[in-house]
């Protein structure tokens, strides 16, 4: 069993409290009350600790703008089924990020969300997605991707790397 090596609480604007802990197997877990339904992580965690796996608790519904950008040591992100939105540049520049689960229920992936995550080579897009904004997966290692949608959704300009092969279901409707 993993041992907690660091932990803390952050009081957010409006008085909500969010807790976090880091275990000796390099896992950061964030949980607790969230302001505006969006996790906002203070610079204290970023500057003090190194971890490879980020786990967000089931209470998280959105990840805010630039929350985890340029966290070079993150290799894996586990998102809860409650997540609905990953906002602009949430994981921008996480160059060692290799694995992200996008659970059923997620609806929006903001612009530049995973841009610059050059180690990210595969991603499974759930059919609950309604919007993927510009450059969401640009400058990643994704070479091919299958989209599950039979109905058109919003996909922004250059949301995948330039040479990405996109597979579309045969029964998909034209926009």
Label the predicted regions:
Residues 2-5, 35, 39, 175:
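Viral virion structural and adsorption modules
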Residues 4, 9-11, 15-22, 29-31:
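Solvent-exposed adhesion/ligand-recognition segments of exported proteins
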Residues 15, 37-40, 64-66:
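A composition-driven surface/loop motif
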Residues 19-20, 155-158:
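Short, flexible, solvent-exposed loop/turn segments with mixed acidic/basic and small polar residues
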Residues 23-35, 49-62, 72-85, 95-108, ...:
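Structural signature of tandem-repeat unit edges
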Residues 40-48:
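Right-handed beta-helix
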Residues 44, 64-67, 87-92, 110-115, ...:
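Consensus positions within tandem repeat domains that build extended binding/scaffold surfaces
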Residues 158-161, 175:
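Short loop/helix-cap segments at secondary-structure boundaries that form the rim of catalytic
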